[in-house]
């Protein structure tokens, strides 16, 4: 087979909450930025319908085209504005602006002009400019003529708003509010007190929103207050009123379409609706899960949506009832558990919300569910010391899950708990089995299960800074009836009071390797006797893993000083070593390959090798500009068939890695979106739409029609081809009219697709309904004659040979007479 080059692709994990989400005009779709992609979701099914990719840097703004509601604009840090057909996921046009674009606005009555936030030459200084997008038939258009509007603004789009149908624009930064009137070409500036006393220290502006119909500006502040500004046409006569409910900073504001209500959100995880600008008349939607960062309103006014700090988008009905949740990969402060794979669901498992493990589908790029480990109510307070989930590991094909949580207010007060969870087939989830308080006297640095199939009972090993590693086994004597099972400590090991840093089992489970700072110890898992030690004196051991399959006799280790070592367990000596600053080392559980990601001055480099050979099989430089923190091999549902030795490591597993900014990347030959044609994307979109009464009736009709066709085909000599299976007709019916070629070009293709091929035999005895009534007597009278004619034709065919094949029977002549009566004059109209 012809193999394509392996390249790094973003497979998910990008921030969905980087900018405000945008609704389509009919509220069927919601658009959100996701790294350098734009994702199109269904508001009812929560499924991703399309992924719009074409930008080379982060997408910083999206808006529906006011001139064509089936099109979407997007701007990016790459300095371009792209116009999309979001129904089919097609890029229509690219406008090259030049500078880095931070925000994007299209007010009413803009007349092909858009407003952009760009950076000046000075750091942290931004401008609001306008640019006219020229009308051109070319797909790549340059629009570099920028018109200055406002200076010294905040780059966040939440700090700029257009009001009263685009008559003015309001911008806030620090303690200043600026209002620019387009007709008057005048700017009014307003300032709040900014003294250092406690009363005025939190007057700083955080966001702004403008009333769609009236001259009213709403601003949010650090102290949780909302100010409604009026009479701001003059610097002296302005007034404002205060609304106060939030105890912390107001994160975002949004007016409804009619302007009768104002929506606000903050760190309280509560959406507040202020009706008629009154503090007494407000409604709440509480317990949204995490801080609200953005608020959006649909053009029809029937839906709201909130973007949250845990990379989640919540779709809300007008009556403040949450209807859908689009959950991305949760961005935790630190991924201390690393990347794991659930053996049952093949989902990616890592830290999620505080105190939770998230199970994330790599195929669907969405969260499956959260597992609450700490089981405590989370209090959003920066000064409060939270209980953190630090370690986790799966064992026994996903039957057991071990987690470690800790809380430490100071160096001398450490709260440590280890929990063992058992998978319940009845509840289809993990149930807490054993909770162990203070399993070690210091922080737990590593834990691992013995997953060898030869061992009937599971074994868990934990390593700690207290200088010990402990072996935990499952016992059934936790009560007098011996019906309950629980985990208990079976063995405690140490080595010269060094801190234990890593631990891992061999593939067959017979050996346990535990690293104590710079020394690696090998233990017999049956008797827990120390077999041998390896001392490389090249720094503390950072990673430790055994080889697999043909390389099971090797042990790999990396050090803090940038040394990669390979030891031979049979000869108890070092096999080879290399100078490599390895940050991530992961063995493939389904092959003998090992992936190592090393940090260099230019970025992160990938090395794939076998422990038996010091020469790497595959090297790819600069897989990421930033540091790679975690990696994991995920088994494929359908194995690949790469024949090249450099690509065989991708056959059974796929390597995923997580960067410092928590972007999830992988290696592939082709992205999933590139494998889809526009027609198949449209079909996918239709399949993701909800089942309506009409579609239910239509589906039953199609099933009945298909059953009739099946019954008819059993009695017919030949079945006519169905139009659903003809590519030309499918393409014509499912492609939007505005992207189709001219009718004259499609006519010949469409008509030819309806014609029968030469190889298809004509049906002999399938009369029409009309013909059954009109020619009933004729068929009866000619039945005997047809049989006689067929006998004669059979005898003549024997004598005449091929010449007899071209003679027509009586029934065939009748079929031809039917076709002569058909009116084909409609073809001339095309």
Swiss-Prot record:
WD repeats: 4-42, 46-85, 89-130, 144-183, 192-230, 236-275, 278-317, 323-361, 375-422, 429-473, 486-524, 528-568, 573-610
Alphabetic keyword roster: Isopeptide bond, Nucleus, Phosphoprotein, Repeat, Ribosome biogenesis, rRNA processing, Transcription, Transcription regulation, Ubl conjugation, WD repeat
Record cross-link Glycyl lysine isopeptide (Lys-Gly) (interchain with G-Cter in SUMO2), residues: 426, 675
Any one biological process term the GO annotation gives: positive regulation of transcription by RNA polymerase I
SUPFAM superfamilies reported in the protein's UniProt record: Quinoprotein alcohol dehydrogenase-like (SSF50998), WD40 repeat-like (SSF50978)
Predominant place of localization: nucleus
Any one GO cellular component localisation term in the record: nucleolus
Statement: the UniProt record of this protein carries the keyword Metal-binding: no
Residue positions where Phosphoserine is found in the record: 663, 671, 778, 781, 811
Pfam families registered for this protein in UniProt: Beta-prop_WDR75_1st (PF23869), Beta-prop_WDR75_2nd (PF23769)
GO molecular function, one term: RNA binding
Region (Disordered): 761-807
Compartments reported by the entry: Nucleus, Nucleolus
Role according to the record: Ribosome biogenesis factor. Part of the small subunit (SSU) processome, first precursor of the small eukaryotic ribosomal subunit. During the assembly of the SSU processome in the nucleolus, many ribosome biogenesis factors, an RNA chaperone and ribosomal proteins associate with the nascent pre-rRNA and work in concert to generate RNA folding, modifications, rearrangements and cleavage as well as targeted degradation of pre-ribosomal RNA by the RNA exosome. Involved in nucleolar processing of pre-18S ribosomal RNA. Required for optimal pre-ribosomal RNA transcription by RNA polymerase I.
Subunit structure: Component of the proposed t-UTP subcomplex of the ribosomal small subunit (SSU) processome. SSU processome is composed of more than 70 proteins and the RNA chaperone small nucleolar RNA (snoRNA) U3.
Name under which the protein is recorded: WD repeat-containing protein 75
Organism of this sequence: Mus musculus
């Amino acid at each position: 087979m012809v193999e394509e080059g392996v390249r790094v692709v973003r497979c998910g994990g990008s921030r969905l909450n980087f900018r405000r989400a945008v609704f389509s005009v009919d509220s069927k779709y919601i658009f959100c930025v996701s790294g350098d992609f734009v994702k199109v979701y269904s508001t009812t099914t929560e499924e991703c319908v399309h992924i719009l990719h074409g930008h080379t840097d982060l997408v910083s703004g999206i808006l529906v085209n006011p001139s064509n509601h089936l099109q979407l604009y997007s701007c990016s840090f790459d300095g371009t504005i792209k116009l999309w057909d979001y129904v089919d996921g097609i890029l229509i046009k690219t406008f090259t602006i030049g500078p880095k674009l931070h925000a994007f606005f299209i007010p009413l009555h803009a007349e092909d002009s858009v407003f952009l936030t760009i950076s000046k030459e000075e750091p942290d200084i931004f401008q609001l400019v306008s640019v006219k997008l020229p009308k051109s038939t070319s797909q790549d258009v340059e629009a570099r003529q920028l018109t200055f509007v406002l200076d010294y603004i905040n780059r966040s789009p939440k700090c700029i708003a257009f009001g009263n149908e685009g008559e003015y624009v309001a911008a806030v930064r620090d303690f200043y509010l600026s209002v620019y009137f387009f007709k008057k070409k005048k700017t009014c500036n307003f300032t709040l007190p900014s003294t250092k006393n406690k009363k005025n220290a939190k007057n700083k502006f955080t966001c702004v929103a403008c009333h769609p119909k009236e001259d009213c500006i709403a601003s949010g502040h650090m102290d949780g207050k909302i100010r409604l500004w009026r009479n701001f046409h003059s610097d002296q006569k302005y007034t404002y009123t205060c609304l106060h409910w939030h105890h912390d900073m107001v994160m975002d504001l949004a007016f409804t379409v009619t302007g009768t209500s104002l929506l606000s959100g903050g760190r309280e995880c509560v959406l507040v609706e202020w009706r008629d600008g009154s503090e007494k008349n407000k409604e709440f939607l509480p317990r949204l899960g995490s801080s609200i960062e953005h608020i959006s309103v649909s053009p029809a006014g029937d839906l709201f949506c909130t973007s949250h700090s845990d990379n989640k988008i919540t779709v809300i009905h007008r009556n403040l009832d949450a209807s859908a949740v689009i959950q991305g990969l949760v961005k935790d402060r630190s991924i201390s558990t690393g990347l794991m794979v659930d053996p049952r669901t093949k989902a990616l498992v890592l830290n999620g919300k505080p105190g939770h493990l998230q199970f994330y589908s790599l195929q669907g790029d969405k969260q499956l569910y959260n597992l609450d480990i700490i089981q405590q109510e989370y209090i959003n307070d920066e000064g409060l010391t939270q209980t953190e989930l630090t370690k986790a590991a799966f064992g026994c094909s996903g039957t057991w899950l071990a987690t470690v949580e800790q809380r430490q207010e100071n160096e001398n007060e450490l709260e440590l708990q280890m929990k063992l969870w058992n998978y319940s087939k009845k509840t289809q989830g993990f149930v807490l089995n054993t909770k162990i308080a203070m399993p070690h006297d210091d922080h737990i640095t590593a834990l691992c299960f013995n997953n060898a199939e030869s061992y009937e009972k599971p074994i868990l090993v934990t390593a700690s800074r207290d200088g010990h590693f402990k072996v935990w086994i499952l016992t059934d004597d936790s009560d007098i009836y011996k019906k309950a099972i629980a985990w208990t400590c079976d063995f405690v090991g140490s080595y010269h009071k060094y801190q234990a840093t890593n631990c891992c089992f061999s593939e067959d489970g017979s050996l346990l390797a535990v690293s104590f700072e710079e020394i690696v110890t090998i233990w017999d898992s049956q008797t827990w006797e120390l077999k041998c030690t390896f001392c490389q004196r090249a720094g503390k051991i950072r990673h430790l893993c055994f080889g697999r399959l043909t390389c099971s006799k090797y042990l790999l280790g990396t050090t803090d000083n940038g040394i990669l070592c390979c030891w031979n367990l049979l000869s108890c000596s070092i096999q080879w070593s290399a100078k490599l600053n390895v940050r991530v080392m992961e063995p493939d559980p389904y092959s003998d390959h090992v992936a190592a990601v090393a940090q260099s001055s230019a970025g992160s480099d990938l090395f794939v090798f076998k422990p038996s050979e010091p020469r790497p099989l595959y090297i790819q430089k600069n897989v990421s500009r930033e540091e790679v923190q975690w990696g994991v091999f995920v088994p494929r549902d359908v194995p690949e068939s790469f024949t090249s030795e450099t690509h065989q490591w991708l056959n059974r597993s796929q390597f995923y890695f997580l960067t410092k900014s928590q972007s999830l990347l992988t290696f592939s030959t082709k992205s999933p979106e590139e494998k889809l044609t526009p027609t198949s994307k449209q079909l996918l979109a239709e399949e993701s739409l909800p089942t309506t009464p009409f579609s239910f009736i239509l589906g039953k009709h199609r099933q009945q029609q298909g059953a009739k066709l099946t019954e008819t085909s059993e009695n017919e000599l030949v079945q006519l081809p169905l139009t659903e299976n003809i590519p030309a007709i499918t393409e014509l019916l499912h492609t939007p009219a505005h992207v189709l070629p001219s009718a004259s070009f499609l006519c010949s293709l469409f008509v030819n697709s309806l014609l029968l091929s030469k190889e298809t035999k004509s049906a002999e005895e399938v009369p029409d309904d009309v013909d059954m009534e009109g020619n009933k007597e004729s068929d009866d009278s000619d039945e005997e004659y047809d049989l006689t004619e067929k006998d004669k034709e059979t005898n003549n065919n024997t004598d005449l040979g091929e010449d007899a094949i071209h003679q027509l029977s009586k029934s065939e002549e009748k079929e031809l007479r039917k076709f002569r009566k058909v009116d084909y004059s409609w073809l001339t109209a095309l």
